Each structure stands twice: as C-alpha cells, then as structure tokens.
Amino acid sequence: MNKRMNELVALLNRYATEYYTSDNPSVADSEYDRLYRELVELETAYPEQVLADSPTHRVGGKVLDGFEKYSHQYPLYSLQDAFSREELDAFDARVRKEVAHPTYICELKIDGLSISLTYEKGILVAGVTRGDGSIGENITENLKRVKDIPLTLPEELDITVRGECYMPRASFDQVNQVRQENGEPEFANPRNAAAGTLRQLDTAVVAKRNLATFLYQEASPSTRDSQEKGLKYLEQLGFVVNPKRILAENIDEIWNFIQEVGQERENLPYDIDGVVIKVNDLASQEELGFTVKAPKWAVAYKFPAEEKEAQLLSVDWTVGRTGVVTPTANLTPVQLAGTTVSRATLHNVDYIAEKDIRKDDTVIVYKAGDIIPAVLRVVESKRVSEEKLDIPTNCPSCNSDLLHFEDEVALRCINPRCPAQIMEGLIHFASRDAMNITGLGPSIVEKLFAANLVKDVADIYRLQEEDFLLLEGVKEKSAAKLYQAIQASKENSAEKLLFGLGIRHVGSKVSQLLLQYFHSIENLSQADSEEVASIESLGGVIAKSLQTYFATEGSEILLRELKETGVNLDYKGQTVVADAALSGLTVVLTGKLERLKRSEAKSKLESLGAKVTGSISKKTDLVVVGADAGSKLQKAQELGIQVRDEAWLESL
C-alpha cells in the first residue's frame, strides 16, 4: 500500500501546486476529489504509513490547547512608512549617499498578517506570527491548513521564509455570509477575518476559510544576490509570489507604478494598503544596514487613508505615563475602514492651534496608518461657532500646573506623583511587550491603585493572592492566576524589565540591544554615556536619557527593591562580548557545511561577537565557507576579504 500512497500524495500535491500556485490546473476537480478520497481510505486503513506531506493534513480536525511562544532566529523588522512623493524622494536621497546607482524593486504591500515559515530538510516544522519581531506565536498547525503553503519542498533545505497570510475578498464574502446566516457578528474587513482565523484553536475552521499567502523574502542567509532573484527562487520552491512587481531606476518610475497600482487597487482579488520599495541588490542592502527598528534599504509607501466627515462633540484630556497631556475628540459616529469610529486623537495643543479646531466644528477624520483614528482638518464651510476649544492649564489628574516647553508640541505634567502617570506606568509595566503579566490589565491595575495596594512597580511583586480578593469582581481562581503570572514574570529576561521601566526613548528594540551589550541592568546603570552612545544604532539622545534616569535616587531604590523581590535583572538572550574573538566583525556564511547546521554556525559566530549577514559587501570582514561556496567565495577573494573554513570555526 505504501507505494500507492506515495503515488497519490505526489499526484495530489502536484495538482494542488498547479491549482493554487501556478493557477493552471491539469485535471478536473472531480478527478482530484476521486484521488483524494482514495488516499483518505488508504490512510484510514494504514495510519502508521501516513506521509508527512500528505494533503490530508490540511483538512483540519485538531483542536489546539493554545499557541506557544516562539523566538525568531531572524528578527522581523518593521518598515519605515512614506505617505508622499516628497518622502520617497528623501528616502532615495538617503540611499544614494551610500549606493551610487541603486536599482529598486517595487512589490505590493498585502494587507494581511506577517508570517515566518521554517523548513528543516525540506519539511515545514514551524509557522509563526510576527509578534513583536523577536517573539511570535507558533501557529504551525493552522498554517498547514492554508492550501498554498507547501508542506514539503522539492529540495531537502533548511530555510526560513517570510510572507503575508491574507483572506481573499471572495473568501471574505463567503465567510461573512455564513456568519450572517448563523447569527454571528460579521468581520469588519479581510485583515480582521484573517487574523481571527489564524487565532482559531480548531484547525477545521481554518481549513474551511480558504486563506492564502504571498511569500516575499528568504529570511535565512540567501545564496541569491538580489531581491528579484530571491523571489524567483521562492517560486521555484513552490511558494506563491505576487507577480505584480517592477524594477525601477528612479523615483519617477516608482511613482508611476504607485499611481498605476492605486488605480487597479479596487479590482484586485485581495486587499493591499501600499507599495513596498526595496533596494534590489542584497550587497547594497548590507551596506545600508538597519536602524533599531527598520531596514534603511526599504520603505513602505502607504496609500491615502479613507476620510469621513464627523461633528466634534467634545474633547477629553488624558495624562500618559510620561506626563504628556493628549486631547481626544468625541465625534458623531462614522464608519471608517470597516469599523465604527466615535473618538479620534487631536494629537496635541500645537496641532489644535495649527488646524484652528473650534467647538462644534465639522472635521475630517481618518485612520492614521490605517489604525489610529485621527482628526485631519476642519471643514470650514460648515463651521457653526467661532468659540475656541478650552485648553486646560491644570493637570486633569493631579491639578498641578501644566507646562508647555518651547521645544515641545504638547502640554506636560511634571509632577512625579501624578496618579495618572503612576497608573499608566503600572499598566505599561505589566503589558505584553514589557513584563507580560497575563491578566494584569488596565482594569485590575486601576482597582489595585485605587485600593492603595500598589504605588510603584516594585509593589506588584509584594502582592499576595489574598490582596486580589479585596478587589471587586475578582474570585479565588482569578486571584491565583494573577499571583502565578506575577511570580512567573520574575524570570523574564532583563530587556523586558528595562522596557517596562518606561525610560524615555528606550523602546523594546533599544532595550534588547542595550542588554546584549551590557548583560544586566546593573551593568547598564553603571555605564557612562559615551559607551552607550558608541553602540551601533544608538546615540547621544538615548545615552543622555539613560544617564538622567539612573542618576536619580529613586531609580536606584527601585532597582534594589525589584532585586530583593526576586525579579531577574540579567539578560538571558545571546549576548555580545566586547572582547570576544570576533567582536565587531561582519561575517558571511556561504556554501554547504558538513558538520554544523547553518543555524548552529550562525549562533556560534554571534556568541563570539560577530554580526552575521547574507551578502558580501565592502563592510564584510570575514567569510566562512563550506563546500560549493561558488560566487560568494570568488567575490570575497576579489575584494581581498579574509576566508576561513568550517574547521576553523569549530576550533574557536
């Protein structure tokens, strides 16, 4: 039976590739169904012989307990946004300072969910969400139900690829029709539907909803020398790659492509929200490098957001954790990008003055970055009142005088004991990107603060189970879970704590970078500003902010109290040792290694202080080669770059 099962799996996978990837089926649906039923019957009779790449794995049937966290071997960076021709010109100017004659590749920006797929020996072993770029959720079983994702590759490769998982418009309409018939709330848009589907614990639901993918990048070090060649290679491996793309020599060509795509946008079978522009040559990408958050060699042009008119009803002023006082407009409800919007940010007092926003104005509201509702401008022809908005002079939380510094656009409360700032700081500390204390959300934090059970973040770790029972609506089971979540967070790697402290200019990426170098928050607190500023991608502003924070007596006391309660202050990830053998060197791995997996070689190089990249450039210091190194070895020799082999790496 094994031979026939092999034949059926090979045939059905080939037909599926023709249908989903090539859009060129060679057999009728009825023939595919007949062969599929035959395979199901054989697998039912001989379950021990079911093959790893059998298409029956896609049908569903598993109910998952939840999704485990998964650390990305290769981080997923965000992209810098551009909203105008002028911003694209500025991007081009920055690139040309480093690259004399760049060629760009323009690809559609799919409005879906970023995914990472990892294959070992050609078999899909992990499908993961983007998460925060460093840690995502393992949704492998759900992604196996997406019919155009290959379960196996034609080669026994170890490879990680990136792409977007989305819901086609036709599938979206079908899903919403079923939900309507079942009396369930409809999804607002295809992106929300795709996100909700991938979060399903029942894989059978995923299988029914006909999600699709476009792959756009090999995340693991590529043997191709350009993005365009990389896309063609992904196609050869059986992935679906969006065919709508161009190579461009200048911004005029890019802008023409953007205008063309904008006109076709509504007729596409899937949603897009822009065009991604990348430097095509991978060596040039390497020269340009990254900021802390984004590659310097790419930009995402975003199409203008949908706009609607609404009437301004009133303005709320709220205090954030840094003391900035933000105005929020209350509006007559409008439908915007698939959701009902009744509140929108007014940004700050300078924005209100610049836009001359007055009481009862009719305003244009849109979603900034397709996410945050914001007031864009006033419809002056519909103005009904000349009365200006009331700008507060005192903090709405603590009644302290508000300040408006010359170099800032916002009002600010500088009272360190302001209740709103303290509470927002506690909420931030417990949030997912910081200490990730499950269940300790804004509602519970507000109740703890109101009951005077917590005044600073160290107090969180002094709480006992019985303290939670004092809060309205909290039962014994919830109290136990909250206490357990707090105890578990003590073991977090220290970059989570550093971000949670809410130091100005120190975000999650910066926190990780700092701890990679200084290994612990205690070491960082003793570092001088010159040492911090010398770290690549950081600078004087961050260094000064850290120096100011750690110079205060309060920070010293807080860190001591956190340590006394058992909170970990050490970094648990891969550190960078300043005096390591390869510290500060840029290294390229190429060719087939015989004894080490590529991931093992990369980890070892990084542990020795090296930055491992995929392309050879003038910034490359060393190339480690295996068998069949090919053009990269030749290029290294031409550039006079030092070359070492696998045995040398093992000896370190």
Swiss-Prot record:
Membrane-spanning parts: none
Keywords attached to this entry: DNA damage, DNA repair, DNA replication, Ligase, Magnesium, Manganese, Metal-binding, NAD, Zinc
Biological function: DNA ligase that catalyzes the formation of phosphodiester linkages between 5'-phosphoryl and 3'-hydroxyl groups in double-stranded DNA using NAD as a coenzyme and as the energy source for the reaction. It is essential for DNA replication and repair of damaged DNA.
InterPro entries per the UniProt record, alphabetical: BRCT_dom, BRCT_dom_sf, DisA/LigA_HHH, DNA_ligase, DNA_ligase_AS, DNA_ligase_CS, DNAligase_adenylation, DNAligase_N
Molecular function as annotated in GO: DNA binding; DNA ligase (NAD+) activity; metal ion binding
GO biological process: DNA repair; DNA replication
Protein name in the entry: DNA ligase
Domain BRCT: 577-652
Gene Ontology, cellular component aspect: cytosol
Coiled-coil ranges per UniProt: none
EC number(s) reported in the record: 6.5.1.2
Required cofactor names: Mg(2+); Mn(2+)
Organism whose genome encodes this protein: Streptococcus pneumoniae (strain ATCC 700669 / Spain 23F-1)
